[in-house]
């Protein structure tokens, strides 16, 4: 069956307000610029800009902000046929506090948010069958009815041979407690093909399936999760990231840059890596170099979605490799060797 879409995503859509009078406390900021936000939305836009066909399962408010999101998606050539409007819920609002190049905080308003109102009846098997990869953002598991909708999409994809990517995307907002987080993250992770998360997110996902997960290192987590998935990426902020498969381990550094803000790189990282994973799975070293380069580019940007064109990212990556040929290193590794 010919696939109409390269990726369909399900997850968080928000409105971001980033201060233009930055390096200031939020209470003293007066001027803000409005952007589309949310990890799933940012990744969808990034993938579309990389010439992928992208669809989306989602829910937005039936108001001006909801219209803004749909207009942005249409302008970015993302299919909106499965994004519904809800009259009784509003899109989440995110205000960013950019205190310095290194330090940023986020103030979120996510009570009864629209993006968590997607329902099991909104999940269409025919739509899922039209994609090569389903990308699930972990925030969409925080509450019902979105939680059940995501699980339906997960199992429909899995049972029909559609690859599933789990972008953990943990945000404490909306969740009742950590046990709930770990329970649903574990269910999705154990039924995925690829996991992307920070060390802390992987630890949270592993609380019920590994003993004393807080004492484990990246390699320990990888050995466990590779029993279920084909590939896992563990990110460690300024320490870089690691990619694991059963017989492959790659270690990527970050590309040092003068940052504008201390967040926003993760969605660009995911966009570039997933694009490369789909198009050239045999060359993951280059995919990881592109991903870490894209992350460094985005922490210099005022928004978290405005990914530059591929040629600029490629040039940035090539220059980074000239400065540091060991930007991505291959390590000796076999997950199941005794």
Swiss-Prot record:
Its EC number is 2.7.1.92. Gene3D superfamilies: 3.40.1190.20, putative 5-dehydro-2- deoxygluconokinase. It is an enzyme of class 2 (transferase). GO terms for molecular function: 5-dehydro-2-deoxygluconokinase activity; ATP binding. Keywords: ATP-binding, Kinase, Nucleotide-binding, Transferase. It catalyses: 5-dehydro-2-deoxy-D-gluconate + ATP = 6-phospho-5-dehydro-2-deoxy-D-gluconate + ADP + H(+). Pathway: Polyol metabolism; myo-inositol degradation into acetyl-CoA; acetyl-CoA from myo-inositol: step 5/7. It comes from the Bacteria. HAMAP family: IolC. Catalyzes the phosphorylation of 5-dehydro-2-deoxy-D-gluconate (2-deoxy-5-keto-D-gluconate or DKG) to 6-phospho-5-dehydro-2-deoxy-D-gluconate (DKGP). Belongs to the carbohydrate kinase PfkB family. This is 5-dehydro-2-deoxygluconokinase. It comes from Mesomycoplasma hyopneumoniae (strain 7448) (Mycoplasma hyopneumoniae). The lineage of its organism: Bacteria, Bacillati, Mycoplasmatota, Mycoplasmoidales, Metamycoplasmataceae.
């Amino acid at each position: 069956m010919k696939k109409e879409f390269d990726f369909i995503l399900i997850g968080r859509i928000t409105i971001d307000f980033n201060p233009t009078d930055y390096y200031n406390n939020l209470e003293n900021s007066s001027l803000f610029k409005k952007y589309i936000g949310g990890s799933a939305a940012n990744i969808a836009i990034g993938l579309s800009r990389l010439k992928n066909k992208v669809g989306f399962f989602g829910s937005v408010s039936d108001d001006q902000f909801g219209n803004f999101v749909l207009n942005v998606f249409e302008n970015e050539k993302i299919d909106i046929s499965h994004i519904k409007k809800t009259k009784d819920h509003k899109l989440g609002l995110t205000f960013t506090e950019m205190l310095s190049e290194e330090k940023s905080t986020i103030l979120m308003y996510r009570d009864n948010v629209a993006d968590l109102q997607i329902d099991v009846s909104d999940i269409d098997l025919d739509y899922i069958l039209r994609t090569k990869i389903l990308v699930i953002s972990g925030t969409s598991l925080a509450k019902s009815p979105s939680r059940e909708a995501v699980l339906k999409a997960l199992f429909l994809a899995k049972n029909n041979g559609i690859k599933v990517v789990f972008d953990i995307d943990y945000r404490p907002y909306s969740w009742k407690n950590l046990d709930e987080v770990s329970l649903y993250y574990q269910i999705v992770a154990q039924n995925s093909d690829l996991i992307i998360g920070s060390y802390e997110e992987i630890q949270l996902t592993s609380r019920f399936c590994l003993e004393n997960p807080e004492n484990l290192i990246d390699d320990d987590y990888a050995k466990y999760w590779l029993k279920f998935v084909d590939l896992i990426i563990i990110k460690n902020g300024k320490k870089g990231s690691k990619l694991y498969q059963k017989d492959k381990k790659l270690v990527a550094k970050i590309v040092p840059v003068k940052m504008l803000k201390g967040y926003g790189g993760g969605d660009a990282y995911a966009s570039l890596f997933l694009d490369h994973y789909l198009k050239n799975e045999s060359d993951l070293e280059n995919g990881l170099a592109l991903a870490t380069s894209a992350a460094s580019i985005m922490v210099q940007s005022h928004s978290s979605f405005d990914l530059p064109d591929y040629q600029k990212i490629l040039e940035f990556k090539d220059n980074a490799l000239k400065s540091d040929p060991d930007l991505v290193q291959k390590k000796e590794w076999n997950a199941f060797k005794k």
